[in-house]
Structures are given as structure tokens and as C-alpha cells.
Amino acid sequence: MEQGKGLAVLILAIILLQGTLAQSIKGNHLVKVYDYQEDGSVLLTCDAEAKNITWFKDGKMIGFLTEDKKKWNLGSNAKDPRGMYQCKGSQNKSKPLQVYYRMCQNCIELNAATISGFLFAEIVSIFVLAVGVYFIAGQDGVRQSRASDKQTLLPNDQLYQPLKDREDDQYSHLQGNQLRRN
């Protein structure tokens, strides 16, 4: 069993090292994303050393900027900007940067206060429901009259009337002359 654990650790270490090596290979990452703007807009910045910068989205040219304006505004992050963006200077073209925003408009941030609020509301609602069921079920809906306590009860032999013997009825005898066939 120890050999299996050792093999699993070795495989995991190899996979993690491959990911680290793949990330450390530096490419031509000239495009950077800045999405912490006060107005909620998403900006792309090109670090190319050129006077004129051309922006591409999904392989198609979308804009042309001068050197002093290296930032491309994608608009509000609530509009879910997405696509493969590249910038090109006079000498080189950046690697593509995939931008994909998925903003949740009606989401709730789950933190300790929110979860405790949900739990408190759930406990209170269960308590209110239990108290309501207790009071509704505890009420006597039909009250018996006191006259039933004063009735004279019949003796056991008078409760039931004996059956009369009849020869003409189908079920008048328990045993029949004919056997039932399937």
C-alpha cells in the first residue's frame, strides 16, 4: 500500500512541476487587464514600444491608438465583455489574451454573516410553523354534548340482532355443494 501512495505522490509532483514550467515560460505578454475601475469599466493596456498601436479582437482589427493612449476600453464589466484580444506595435504582435466576464447581476455574496442570517431565518420560521401547528391541532374542533354521558347503555346481547335463516339467498350457507373451478 505504501508503494501506491509513493507512486501517487510522484505522479502529482510531476504534474505540478509541468504546470510550473509551462507557466514560467515567458512569452510576448504585452496585453494586461485592469478591471478595478470606479465606474466598472474594463481596460486593456498594451506595453508595446511603438508610436502607433493596433488592437485586434478575435483576429479582426478593432482600433488604432497613438503612443500616448495605450489603453483600450472594453466597456462596463456588467455587459460581459469577452473575446480574444491582441495588440500590435510596429515590431511585434502580442500573444492573444482571452477576456471572458460573467457578471452575476442578482447574486448574493456568501460570507459568514449571510449564512448565519439564513440559518437564523430558517430556525425562526420552523419555530413559528411548529407553534402554529401546535395551536391549530390542539383546539377541540367538535365538542361532545354532555347528554351522551347520561344515556343508558344496552346490554351486550341486545346490541346485535340475530340473522334470520333464509334458504333462497346465494350466501345463506357457508358450505356449498359445488366446488369452485378456476
UniProtKB/Swiss-Prot annotation:
Compartment list: Cell membrane
Domain of life of the source: Eukaryota
Domain Ig-like intervals: 37-94
Gene3D superfamilies hit by this protein: Immunoglobulins
Position of sequence motif Di-leucine motif: 153-154
Keyword Lipoprotein appears in the UniProt entry: no
Cytoplasmic-facing ranges: 138-182
Membrane spanning residue stretches: 117-137
Effect noted on mutating L154A: Abolishes lysosomal targeting
GO biological process: one example: T cell activation
Signal sequence region: 1-22
Free-text comment about domains: A di-leucine motif and a tyrosine-based motif are individually sufficient to induce both endocytosis and delivery to lysosomes.
Name used for this protein in its record: T-cell surface glycoprotein CD3 gamma chain
Organism: Homo sapiens (Human)
Organism phylogeny: Eukaryota, Metazoa, Chordata, Craniata, Vertebrata
Gene expressing this chain: CD3G
